[in-house]
């Protein structure tokens, strides 16, 4: 028998079974999934970067 894997919902912390029984995994519900999406869209969450964000200053559409 295989062991049932569970994770915590990243939004509310509720336990979620990792499998086809949970269509919104790792979220417990569509609501928690949409809350998380909204946080990313509002830039409340971001992936840390070690690079300098000013790299785009060197980009130009005009040939040098």
Curated annotation (Swiss-Prot):
GO biological process entries: regulation of DNA-templated transcription
Region (Disordered): 45-64
Ranges of Acidic residues composition bias in the record: 54-64
A single MF term (Gene Ontology): zinc ion binding
Annotated residues for binding of Zn(2+): 9, 12, 28, 32
Pfam families: YacG
Keywords: Metal-binding, Zinc
Cofactors that this protein relies on: Zn(2+)
Recorded superkingdom: Bacteria
Xref: InterPro entries: DNA_gyrase_inhibitor_YacG (IPR005584), Znf_NHR/GATA (IPR013088)
Co-factor: note: Binds 1 zinc ion.
Function comment: Inhibits all the catalytic activities of DNA gyrase by preventing its interaction with DNA. Acts by binding directly to the C-terminal domain of GyrB, which probably disrupts DNA binding by the gyrase.
PANTHER family, sorted: DNA GYRASE INHIBITOR YACG (PTHR36150:SF1)
NCBIfam families assigned to the protein according to its UniProt record, in alphabetical order: PRK00418.1 (NF001638)
Family named by the database record: Belongs to the DNA gyrase inhibitor YacG family.
Subunit structure: Interacts with GyrB.
Protein name as annotated: DNA gyrase inhibitor YacG
Gene this protein is translated from: yacG
